Amino acid sequence: MMTKIVLIGPVYPYRGGIAHFTSNLAQTFLENGFDLTVISFSKQYPKWLYPGKDDKDLSNGRGAENVEYIFSPLNPFDWFKTFKRIKDLKPDLVILQWWTTFWSFADHSLLSSLRKAGIPTKVIVHNAIPHEGKKIDQLLAKYALGNATRFVVMNKREKKKIKGLVKGALIQFVPHPIYRPFDTEVISKSEAREKLGLDEEKKIGLFFGFIRSYKGLGVLLDAIKILNDEGQLNDFCFLIAGEFWHDKKQYMDKIKAFGIEDHVVVHDHYIPDDQAGSYFQAADFFVAPYTAGTQSGALKMAMGYGLPCIVSSVIADDISRLPSSGNIIIFSDSNAPDLAGKIKTISQSSDTLLGHNDGTELKTWNDLVAGLMVWDEIGN
């Protein structure tokens, strides 16, 4: 008899890193022959709360398999309906995603009901506390997660946070998997650059994803200025691609004040999945200059495309356990001169630090599934 799994979280057509993660995890469970039901959201956020323009990506019309869109954090009646549906499914394991305290009351209710019903549950922790959280977020996280005992973290710092939030928590560490390339047409670097209007002769550094303060775009711009001041910028172009969730004006003013407009291209909108592949195919290297946070989904996408990556030390602690980690250069977080030096290293090491994709991204997802199915940890 197949093992029956219920996976709770956003999937396509919802957009963003967690939806991409949940969709990839669901695909891996199905590929490994599990009896999977995905419980996703009938609605995520009210419009006034969501910082982006829309929380759905309908660009390519794709969806996930075996999904029931019935859970809403806004409606307590849906919490009960979701629990009842899960109970009727009689799963061997329920897996819930945690990344924002906005779900605190809904997740508290659901986890409490699952615990009382004796249904084995694991919580995948993306961020124990929101990146830009306040004091109340710690209280909300403790309130929600206190009804769980078994957790999977993908970053050592999150393990420490969960220990502080949940007494007696059983915690597994599994590195964040490497994303598979988007299911879009494979084109050459030259074709991708022509498509995006980029210079074919320059080395392209890519900064990709929702732009928020902790992701370090300001540090990258400071590093680009240093390269410009040293006369080292002529061979480079930096592509900033993503929707601004933070004050766009301060970054555009900085680009102008630094006189680096000719070397920075900004695509200031959400990049849908059916276009995202072109950005990674056009790039020579990827930059993740985070000043805070846990792990970067965009970084794992870049690794999936085999790009050399320059990564701040603040999010680098889980990378060494992943395949292809030899393609990573780490700089001291918030240190623009160090980042500038590492960018020069990329240029000088072009013959030895070449991107490649050896197909190991699938193994990293299988490793996550294997970790989730450690039966001793879930009491069987």
How would you describe each model-predicted region?
Residues 146-187, 373:
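Donor nucleotide-sugar binding/catalytic pocket of nucleotide-sugar-dependent glycosyltransferases
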Residues 198-215, 221-224, 239:
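Conserved donor-binding/catalytic core segment of Leloir-type glycosyltransferases
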Residues 70, 249-270, 325:
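Nucleotide-activated donor-binding/catalytic signature segment of Leloir-type glycosyltransferases, i.e.
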Residues 278-294, 307:
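Acidic donor-binding loop of glycosyltransferase active sites
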Residues 41-45, 237-250, 269:
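Glycosyltransferase donor-sugar binding loop
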